């Protein structure tokens, strides 16, 4: 029974939203953020990538950098670039990519629901990344950026969302970096707010799609504040909740520097022990067509690799995943890559860059081979989370990413 509530969002005025909004903090580095912000003092990067307020080379973990985030957040409010709503609202956020639109409800979720597993995770988190986000939440006393959650379909919410989607949005813009559309509505009607709260309370669970570190950090800050100050607004953190069947997960692919001492011919022979190997030519990139099929690019040729029966267990929620099959039977068994997080011989190409990027990195000589995977499904993610298991690393890539700066949640 997820507990959610509306909140007094802190938002840019309509005429400033495109000056303020930005990409999420974790999809670009400091140099890119500095370039995108340019001379725009209203860019949210001054809050979420505050190292750009200092000379190049300043560590993003410098205590002065965190303090700058709080100073900038205060400045944005003082200047009227961010203004807090007078009443608690829910919000509706729509994203359109390649003609497909997904609609998310912006809510406040309860930190205890994260702690007790009502909000379910499917990835491990790194303590250093948690600590970074925790410090940012603490110094700003706000959830500047939302967590990306999913829920199983709900007809009542779908009808409510459709009703708002048929009206004129408050914000409506195209993000210049990727050409995706973004729309935003305020849900202030008391009856609609009550309906949203009630329908979420009927659900069994919510699922973290993207933002595991933000969730963990928000929950830790909330727990500390509850212990020190009692209950309050800090019991909750900001999330955008999408119907699971609307979400798009793209392939998250692998490129490897060498063949672990094998010749290309010997490597293909070893692959044939567990896969049906079929050359697909050198002209166009070959996309895996179904689960348990992989695409290999080696020596200028694309290959289809189909996992043979018996190489995975359909009843094992982890072992049936293509990310696990490829890690066990190719990366580990043949190439000797045992830890995807730390091995310097492997890199990952996700999202919109596509198979052409795999080809480019191999053809350049930087990498020896590329392996493309069929995308994980949202149902697989929910099955993993429901079973209490954790996805293998580098398994999911959601697009489009949430834009930051459309609304912010203050913890007091």
Residue ranges of each PLM-predicted region?
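Surface-exposed, charge/polar-rich loops and edge strands
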Residues: 1-412
């Amino acid at each position: 029974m997820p507990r959610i509530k509306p909140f007094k969002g802190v938002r840019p005025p309509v005429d400033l939203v495109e000056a303020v909004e930005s990409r999420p903090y974790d999809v670009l580095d400091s140099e890119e953020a500095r370039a995108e912000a340019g001379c725009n003092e209203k860019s949210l990067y001054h809050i979420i990538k505050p190292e750009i307020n200092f000379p190049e080379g300043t560590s993003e973990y410098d205590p002065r950098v965190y303090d700058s985030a709080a100073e900038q957040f205060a400045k944005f409010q003082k200047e009227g670039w961010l203004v807090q709503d007078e009443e608690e609202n829910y919000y509706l956020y729509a994203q359109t990519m390649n003609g497909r639109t997904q609609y998310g409800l912006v809510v406040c979720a309860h930190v205890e629901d994260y702690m007790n597993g009502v909000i379910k995770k499917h990835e491990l988190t790194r303590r250093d990344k948690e600590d970074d986000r925790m410090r940012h939440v603490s110094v700003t006393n706000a959830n500047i950026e939302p967590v990306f959650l999913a829920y199983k379909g709900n007809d009542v919410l779908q009808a409510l969302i459709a009703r708002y989607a048929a009206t004129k949005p408050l914000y409506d813009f195209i993000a210049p970096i990727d050409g995706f559309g973004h729309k935003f509505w305020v849900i202030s009607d008391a009856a609609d707010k009550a309906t949203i709260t009630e329908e979420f309370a009927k659900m069994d669970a919510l699922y973290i799609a993207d933002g595991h570190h933000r969730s963990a950090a928000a929950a830790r800050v909330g727990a500390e504040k509850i212990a020190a100050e009692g209950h309050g607004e800090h019991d909750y953190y900001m999330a955008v909740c999408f119907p699971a069947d609307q979400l798009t997960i793209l392939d998250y692919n692998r490129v490897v520097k060498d063949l672990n001492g094998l010749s290309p011919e010997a490597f293909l022979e070893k692959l044939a022990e567990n896969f049906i190997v079929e050359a697909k030519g050198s002209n166009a990139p070959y996309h895996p067509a179904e689960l348990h099929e992989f695409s290999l690019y080696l020596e200028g040729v694309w290959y289809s690799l189909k996992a043979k029966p018996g190489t995975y267990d359909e009843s094992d929620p982890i072992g049936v995943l293509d990310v696990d099959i490829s890690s066990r039977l190719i990366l580990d068994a043949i190439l000797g890559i045992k830890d995807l997080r730390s091995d310097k011989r492997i890199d990952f190409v996700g999202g919109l860059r596509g198979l052409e990027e795999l080809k480019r990195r191999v053809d350049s000589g930087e990498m020896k081979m590329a392996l493309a995977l069929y995308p994980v499904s949202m149902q697989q993610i929910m099955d993993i989370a429901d079973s209490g298991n954790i996805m293998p690393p580098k398994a999911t890539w959601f697009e489009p990413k949430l834009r930051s700066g459309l609304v912010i949640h203050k913890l007091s």
